[in-house]
Amino acid sequence: MSIATPASSDLLRRTFLEFFAQRGHEIVPSAPLVPQNDPTLMFVNAGMVQFKDVFTGKDRRPYQRAASSQKCIRISGKHNDLENVGVTARHQTFFEMLGNFSFGDYFKEDAIAFAWELLTKVYDISPSRLVVTIYNGEGGFPADDEAAAIWRKVTGFGDDRILRLGLADNFWTMGDVGPCGPCSEIHFFHGKEPDVARFGEEPRIDGTGWTEIWNNVFMQYERAEKDGPLVPLPAPSIDTGMGLERLASVLQGVTSNYDTDLLRGLVDKAAELSGKPYSGGSADDDVSMRVIADHARTAAFLIAEGVMPEKQRREYVLRRVMRRAIRHGHRLGIDRPFLHEVALEVVRRMGETYPELRDRRELIARVTEDEEVRFRSTLKRGMKILDERFDEMRSSGERTLPAAAAADLYTTYGFPLDLTQVISAESNFDVDVQGAEAIIKGAGEADGPIDPTAAVDPAHREARAKLAQPVVFTGYEHEEGDSEIVAIVRVEIQGEGDRARKVRALVERAEAGAAVEIVVRETPFYAESGGQVGDVGEVTADGARVEVKDTQKPLAGLVVHEGVVHEGALAVGQRVHLAVDHAARSATRRNHSATHVLHWALRKVLGEHAQQKGSRVGPDVLRFDFTHNRPLTREEISRIEDLVNEKVLTNAKVTTEILAMDEARRRGAMAIFEEKYGDTVRMLTMTPEVVELCGGTHACALGDIGLFKITSEGGVAAGVRRILASTGLNALAYARGVEAELARARQVAKAQGGDLAEKIGKIVAHERELEKKVAELERRILEGAGPAQGGGGGGIDAMLDGARDIGGIKVLARRVPDGTNPGALRDLAEKLRDKLGDRSAVLLGAAVGDKAQLAVMLSKSATERLKAGELIKPIARIVGGSGGGRPDMAQAGGTDVAQLDAAIAALYTEVERALAS
C-alpha cells in the first residue's frame, strides 16, 4: 500500500504512526517541550529524550517497542542554528520528529527493513533518489560492516550508494558515559538528476541537493566511565528520528521546508501583514517572512506550556526568539503589533493535533502581544542609540562596537545582544561579542549552565538487582506492614562543607548508630515523587529500631527507607515491621488533596492558563506554583479560598481508579505537563470538576481537609506565581497567630475595636510628615555646610570647588556630612550637577550608620560618553558593596565605611578609564 502524493503533513504523521503500530509498537504521545526531570537540557530536542531513562536502565516501560511524533526545539547548546533559520531551506527552531524505538527488542535488521519499507513502499519514494551512510570505523570504534551488509541485502545497493562516513557523522553518544553506537542515515536528493558525486556538498539555498531525512541509531555499546573501554550492551536498542518537515518537503514536491503545508501558511500570513509579496527566494524580505513563521510557531508552543518571556533560562530563550521575530517584522515595515496574529494562525493550523494550543489560545495571544508592545519601545530606543554610535564610529574609523556599549544596551535597555549583532552587521560593523558576554555575565544577567543530573549510585543498582520485581507499595490501603529486608545500604559522609558527599555500599548487617537505606520487598512507606515528600516512621524487628527520616525512589522499581539504626542490629533476610508516622501521613494527605482543589479554584478564578508548574506537599507545607503573569489581588485570593472551602464543606468522597491513559483523558482527567505518566495511570476524582492524575496519598473525603487558608502569594520566576497554604490544625494555628499579632498591634497603636486601620493610618501619615521635615532640615544643613565634612559654611556654591575637567567633562567628587540619607544625597548631587552645567558628572558619598552610601549624577550630554550605572560598580566594590542605575543616575551602598574616601576619589580615575575605552 502506498499513499497518494502530494500528501498532507497530517496524513504523513498518521501514516508513520499507523505503520509502526501495525508492527507492534506502542504509540506514545509527544512529551512536553520542557524536559521532565532532566536538567541537562533546555528543551526536548529529539524523540529519544523522553525514553532516555529507559535506554540507561533507570526506568522500565510495559512495552519494548515504541513510536512517536515528538515536538522539538533546537535553539541552544550544540544544536543551535538560530542564525540559519529563514536563511536556508532546512533550518527551524521548532520541528516535529517522527521516531521508532526498540528497548532491547529488535535491532539493525528490522530497523533497516522497517525504514526502507516505509519510505519506498508506503511513502513511494524512488530508491534512485536515496543513498545511505554507515560508520566507517575510526576513533577506536569498529566499522559497522553489519549494517552495510543488511543495507545491501534490503536495498540491492552497491558500495557506491552505501557511503562510509566518520565519527562526527555516523557515531552517536548520549554523553561522556552511557549507551552509544554507530548510526545510519538515509539521504534524499532534491533536484532533477540525483548525483552521488555531489553528496558531500551542502544543499543550495533553494534546498536542491542531498539532505538527510532519517537517522537510525544502533545503541550497541556502553561506556561506563569517560574515555573508558566500550562494552557491548546485553540488549542492544534502536533510536531513530525523521523530521516531519523534511519528509513533507519530499512528498509534497517542494525543496524548502517553508513551502510545506506545515509552514507555508504562516509565511503567507507574515507576507499578508507586511503588505509585501513572498517570492520564496533569498531576498531579505523573504528571509524575514520565514523567520517570523518559524519563531511564531516556537513562541506559541512554549507559551502553551507555561513558558513566559523573561530574563532567565528558558524564558530568556523565548524572549530572544520573539524579539528576533518582531525585529524582522520591523524590517518588513510592519509598524504595529503583529506577532500575536501569526501565533494565532499557528493555533488555527495545529490546534487539532496539539490541543494545548487551542486550550491556551487567549494566553498565547495576550503574551505575544504584550511582549511586542514592550519590545517596540525598546527597539526604537536601541536603534536610536546604535545609529548615533555608528555615526561616531564612522567619524573615528572604528569597525567594532565596543563590548561595554553592546552590554549596556542589554543590561540597561533589555536590547538582545544577538540583535545588536544583526543590526551592526547590516551597517557593516562588528561587535565585541565575547567581551559583551563577559560583562553581562559579571552583571548577573547571563543564564548559567544547567547542571546535569547525578548518575545512579552503583550501590542502588546492586540493590535493585537483588529484587526479583519492583518494590510493591501497600500504603494506599495500609500504614503498617511486615516484609523481608532484601538489601541494606550503609551511608557514610566523606568530606566537609561543599565537598561533602554520600558514599554508599551494600552491607549484610547494620549496627546501632549506622546511617542506612533499607530495601524491602513491599512497603507502606510512600517514596517521594510527584511533589509529595517521602514518608517518615519506624522499621522494627527483634529489639532493633530504625528511625526512618525519609523515603526515596533513586531508581525505577527501587524504594529506600533512609534513616539511622537507634537500637539493636538489622540483617539482610530478616523480617521487619514497617510503620508510617500516622500524624505526618494524615497531614500530608490533607495538604495533597487540597492542592488539587486549589488547582481547580485557580483556573476558575484566574482562567485556564493558571496551570500547575510545580508543587511540594508534606505534613507542614503546601506549596503550589502556577502560571500567571501578575500578583493576585486580595479579592482573588479570598475567592480562591472560598471556592476551596466550599468544596471541603461538601465532604465529597475522594475516589481513585487505575485506568489506561487514553481513557483517563477521555473522562476529563487533568494531566500536568511536567509530570511523567505511564500507559496506565491513577485517576483521582474529588468532584465532577476536580479530576486529575496523581500517584500520591490523599484524604478519604474532602471534609478531612478541615480548613484551607492561603498564607502567602508571590512570584518565584518569570510568569510563575507561588501560593503557600495551610490545612486542618495548621490552618487553625495560622489563624490564631494572625489574631495574636492583631492584638499586639492594637495594644501598640492604642486602638479599640475596629479602629486599628485608622490608627495605623494616622501614625504612618505623621511619620511621613516628620520625614519631610527631617529631609528639609538636612537639605538646609547640607547646602550651608560647604565642603568640609563637619560643616563650616560656604553653601552649595563652595562645594563646586575642586571640580576637574576630564576630557571635556566637569567631574566633582565630594563627601558630605555623615548621616545624610540616600534621598538627600541624591537630591544634592542633582543640584550640584545642574550648577556645574552641561557635560558634568557628580559623585557624593556619606556614612550612614555602619553603611557607606554613594550617589552619581550625570548630565544628559555626559551620558553620550559615560554611564552612571557603569561608573558606580567598581567604586561600590571599594566599600565592599554593589550598585547600579540608569545612564544618568546611579546609587550604591557598602559595608566598608573606612574606604569611603578612597571610593569617592576613585570617580576621577573611573571617568578617565571610561573615556579612554
Swiss-Prot record:
Any one GO BP annotation for this protein: negative regulation of DNA-templated transcription
Annotated keywords: Aminoacyl-tRNA synthetase, ATP-binding, Cytoplasm, Ligase, Metal-binding, Nucleotide-binding, Protein biosynthesis, RNA-binding, tRNA-binding, Zinc
Gene3D superfamilies per the UniProt record, alphabetical: 2.40.30.130, 3.10.310.40, 3.30.54.20, Bira Bifunctional Protein, Domain 2, Threonyl-trna Synthetase, Chain A, domain 2
Enzyme class: ligase
Gene Ontology molecular function, alphabetical: alanine-tRNA ligase activity; aminoacyl-tRNA deacylase activity; ATP binding; tRNA binding; zinc ion binding
Entry EC number(s): 6.1.1.7
GO cellular component: cytosol
Binding residues annotated for Zn(2+), in chain numbering: 592, 596, 694, 698
Reactions mediated catalytically: tRNA(Ala) + L-alanine + ATP = L-alanyl-tRNA(Ala) + AMP + diphosphate
CDD domains cross-referenced by the UniProt entry: AlaRS_core (cd00673)
Cofactor(s) required, per the database record: Zn(2+)
InterPro entries xrefs: aa-tRNA-synth_II/BPL/LPL (IPR045864), Ala-tRNA-lgiase_IIc (IPR002318), Ala-tRNA-ligase_IIc_anticod-bd (IPR018162), Ala-tRNA-synth_IIc_core (IPR018165), Ala-tRNA-synth_IIc_N (IPR018164), Ala-tRNA_ligase (IPR050058), Ala_tRNA_ligase_euk/bac (IPR023033), DHHA1_dom (IPR003156)
Subcellular location: Cytoplasm
Cofactor binding mode and count: Binds 1 zinc ion per subunit.
SMART domains documented for this protein: tRNA_SAD
Family indicated by similarity: Belongs to the class-II aminoacyl-tRNA synthetase family.
Function: Catalyzes the attachment of alanine to tRNA(Ala) in a two-step reaction: alanine is first activated by ATP to form Ala-AMP and then transferred to the acceptor end of tRNA(Ala). Also edits incorrectly charged Ser-tRNA(Ala) and Gly-tRNA(Ala) via its editing domain.
Domain commentary: Consists of three domains; the N-terminal catalytic domain, the editing domain and the C-terminal C-Ala domain. The editing domain removes incorrectly charged amino acids, while the C-Ala domain, along with tRNA(Ala), serves as a bridge to cooperatively bring together the editing and aminoacylation centers thus stimulating deacylation of misacylated tRNAs.
Entries under PANTHER family matching the protein: ALANINE--TRNA LIGASE, CYTOPLASMIC, ALANYL-TRNA SYNTHETASE
Protein name per UniProt: Alanine--tRNA ligase
Species in which this protein is naturally found: Sorangium cellulosum (strain So ce56) (Polyangium cellulosum (strain So ce56))
Organismal lineage: Bacteria, Pseudomonadati, Myxococcota, Polyangia, Polyangiales
Name of the gene this protein is made from: alaS
